[in-house]
A protein has these predicted regions:
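C-terminal subregion of chymotrypsin/trypsin-like serine protease catalytic domains
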Residues: 214-245
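Terminal peptide-recognition signature
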Residues: 15, 54, 209, 213
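Catalytic nucleophile loop of clan PA
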Residues: 197-218
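PDZ-domain C-terminal substructure recognizer with occasional recognition of PDZ-binding tails
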Residues: 2-40
């Protein structure tokens, strides 16, 4: 966009935009700043990237779902409009531990040469795309989908390198009528995970929740007041969202 703007100079320019989903054409006249660069007074975000967790993969269709919540603009908190995207392998290099009032995060590197497959949608219930049948990251046995109940459960998460481990959690409460993906309250009880991360941190979104040998949901949010507690989305809600993209 910048290169086109500089080529056009200060001549009036027609921009085709979308405002709340509706197309709109605007005419703008660029101005030169103190450095002589043509500007239109708009902050344009053309891409973003982050670490998250793949929740499920269907070998029959190649479809996958991740995060359990949408990717939002960090300033407006609005769901980011989706153009195109890819899923890349990442390696966790460090952890900023979560604490009361401060969300932690996983920090790592992306393998930019390892494009695993395209994303096709960014929704309130997760991001969705496809992986090839020979994807080497897919391993293990398939699990049936089930409904969460209050009680002990586990999550699978990668908080160091590329190793996925299973950690103990407790499903404290089900919130089946929640409309924002916060359909259950969970508490991390595994001492190893608490020691490593302080509880739930950014980057663990999408970590699958397993209970009684079934896939019942995914981790979505952390409680800022207590990093050992957070929310999860039910697997049924996430799968329904994936089928409708």
């Amino acid at each position: 966009f910048q290169s086109l703007l500089q080529k056009n100079g200060t001549d009036a320019t027609a921009l085709e935009i979308k405002r709340q989903g509706s197309p709109l054409t605007l005419s703008v006249e660029p101005e030169r700043n103190e450095q002589g660069i043509c500007c239109i007074g708009a902050w344009i975000r053309d891409s973003m990237a982050g670490i998250g967790t793949v929740t499920y993969y269907d070998p029959a269709t190649g479809d996958f779902g991740a995060l359990g919540h949408g990717i939002t603009d960090g300033d407006t908190m609005a769901l980011m409009p989706f153009g195109s995207g890819s899923i890349l392998p990442s390696t966790v290099k460090a952890v900023k531990k979560g604490s009361s009032g401060s969300a932690g995060e996983l920090r790592g590197n992306f393998d930019l040469s390892g494009d695993l497959g395209p994303l096709c949608a960014n929704t309130d219930c997760g991001i969705f795309g496809t992986l090839p049948a020979d994807c080497t990251l897919v391993a293990g046995e398939a699990l049936p989908v089930g409904d969460a109940v209050e009680g002990p459960a586990t999550i699978r998460a990668n908080v160091s390198g590329d190793e996925v481990r299973e950690y103990a959690v407790e499903i404290l409460k089900r919130l089946p009528n929640a409309s924002d993906g916060r359909e259950m309250v969970i508490s991390v009880t595994d001492p190893d995970l608490i020691a490593a991360t302080g509880g739930i941190v950014q980057g663990m979104s999408g970590s699958p929740i397993l209970q009684n040998g079934k896939l019942v949901g995914a981790v979505t949010h952390v409680l800022l007041s207590d990093a050992t507690k957070g929310y999860g989305i039910s697997m049924e809600t996430m799968l329904n969202a994936g089928e409708n993209v």
